[in-house]
Design a protein with these regions (language model features):
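Alpha-helical membrane-anchoring segments
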Residues: 1-326
Length: 327
């Protein structure tokens, strides 16, 4: 039982959560302007509105322009506050509720994007960690932070695994119906973009790619037990997978891809940035953190608190003038 608890709630640095909060709340601001950006204009067409199951269960009111504009303003303010790790519980849960409703409206007009699942889960679990003392520079570790990150990791992986199950279900619960179909060829013909239009002449290659993607999604749960370099290779594989889908279909998975940061040791980012700043100061000839520079006219103080004479620092021009006056 203890092993199960440790797996679901490992003790990890809280700074990892603080950094991930900043990144994800900033991404939400990007998302509502680039990806799910149409709830306000869509709310002007109530006749096209077909609410999702979640909306029906929660009995949420139908969208209107005042409602969607209010959600937009709440998301703007809430994300700015939460990204700064201020009022993490209040701002975090407000953003989670507003963004869930916002995306539910945007996806109640005929198209549901499953790439937002991990992001929505992340917004709901990150506020549970509460205040992180020291924010990015925190040295505290807790199981609360580990539980939140594990939830995000599970949501990321299940984005792929549930996609594979959906393919099996839509094919009559057959393991071969989807990968043996011509769905990828059909998708490219429907939207001939990028590299995809050059692959139309190779339907067998496209079928091999379908099998590869299907098996990768079906076995994606293995990622949850990987560590070290194996985990890094898995993350790079899925990033490459998303780059490939963009190049052949112009379909991105940015909300899922950004949530892969839940697997990363983000706590190393703060010390790394401090080292970079220290190196730049050294190259510029200035003092690094914790050091002081000599100032002309200052006197040193010995261990007994008495002043001793220190050699003064002169400018090069003054040195040349003095040298010219000496015999």
């Amino acid at each position: 039982m203890n092993a199960v608890v440790r797996w679901f709630a490992p003790v990890v640095p809280e700074s990892r959560v603080a950094i991930l909060r900043t990144v994800l709340y900033a991404f939400v601001l990007l998302d509502i302007h680039l990806f799910v950006r149409d709830p306000i204009p869509l709310s002007r067409h109530p006749e096209l509105y077909s609410p999702l199951l979640l909306v029906r269960v929660l009995h949420l009111p139908p969208p209107s322009v005042p409602l969607t504009v209010t959600l937009y303003v709440v998301l703007l303010v809430g994300c700015v506050v939460a990204a700064a790790n201020r009022l993490p519980r209040l701002a975090g849960f407000v953003v989670a509720a507003a963004f869930t409703w916002w995306t539910a409206i945007g996806m109640s007009y005929g198209k549901v994007d499953h790439d937002h699942m991990a992001l929505v889960v992340a917004l709901w679990v990150l506020p549970t960690v509460g205040v992180v003392a020291g924010r990015w520079g925190s040295r505290q570790r807790s199981a609360q932070a580990g539980w939140a990150l594990r939830c995000i990791q599970i949501a990321v992986v299940f984005t792929y695994f549930l996609s594979a199950l959906t393919k099996i279900r839509s094919g009559g619960w057959s393991l071969t119906s989807w990968p043996e179909s011509s769905i990828l060829l059909w998708a490219i013909i429907r939207r001939p973009n990028g590299l995809g239009q050059f692959l139309i002449a190779y339907p067998e290659l496209l079928r091999v790619m379908q099998w590869f993607a299907f098996l990768a999604e079906l076995t994606s749960v293995v990622v949850l037990w990987l560590r070290g370099r194996a985990l890094l290779l898995a993350a790079l594989f899925w990033m490459g997978f998303h780059v490939f889908t963009v190049t052949i279909l112009y379909i991105h998975f940015a909300p899922t891809a950004i949530c892969w940061l839940a697997f990363a040791p983000l706590e190393r980012l703060g010390p790394w940035l401090r080292r970079v700043v220290a190196r730049r100061r050294q190259r510029a000839g200035g003092p690094t953190a914790g050091e002081s520079g000599a100032v002309a006219g200052d006197q040193a103080v010995d261990s007994r608190g008495q002043r001793t004479h220190a050699r003064q620092v002169h400018r090069p021009a003054e040195d040349r003038v003095r040298a010219a006056g000496e015999p």
